[in-house]
C-alpha cells in the first residue's frame, strides 16, 4: 500500500477496485481514528483493498463497488506493514447496499458494513459524525481525504496512512462525467493541482470541518482530477434506517 502522492487519480469502478492518495503527506499516526482498511476477497477469489470509516460501534461506511465475497476490516491502523497493538481486525457479517446501486455508472456508490462484533473505542479507534440530510458543502471548501492507496498512477499502495486536502468544485467541473448527478455526488479536486484519491483509496471519507461528507467513488483513470465522491447527506436517512434495523 502506498502513500498519498498527488490525490489526483481516479477510483476504479470495477469490482472492489480502489483509489490512492496522490500529492498528499503521511498522516500523523492514529490522528484519523475513524479510518478503516478493508481487505476484500472478491467473488473470483482475488484479494484487493479499499478504505472505509467507522460511523458507529458496529458499522463501517464505504463504497458499494468495494463489495466482495468476504471482507475483513482493520481499525486503529497506521502502518499496515506492522502488527500495531492499536489494530482491531473484525470480520464483516453483512454488506448492505441502497436500492438500485448501478455498478456501471457508480450511481448510489455507498455501502454499509455490519461488523461481526462491536469495535472497542480507544484513542486510535473512534467514530466520525455524518452530516444532516440538509447539509450542503459549498464549492471552494477545502476538505481532507485519506487512505492507504497508490501514491502515483504507476506506484504501489502505501503501507502508511496518507492524506491530502482537496477543493470542492462547481458541478460544471465534472461535466465530462456522463452520469454525474450533483444531488447525489460531489465534484472534487482542481485539475492543475494534481492532488486526489486514487486506486486503493476507494470507500474512504471526504472530511470537511470534522464531518464525513463524501465517499471516494470514481474518477477518469488518468490520475487527473476532478474525481467523484458519493454525497453522504443524500443517504443519511437510509443509513439511519439500516443501523436502527440491524
UniProtKB/Swiss-Prot annotation:
Coiled coil: none annotated. One of its GO terms (molecular function) is peptide binding. The active site is at residues 65, 109, 202. Its EC number is 3.4.21.-. It is found in: Secreted; Cytoplasmic granule. The keyword Secreted applies. Mast cells. The gene is Mcpt4. This is Mast cell protease 4. It comes from Rattus norvegicus. It comes from the Eukaryota. Keywords: Disulfide bond, Hydrolase, Protease, Secreted, Serine protease, Signal, Zymogen. Its main location: secreted.
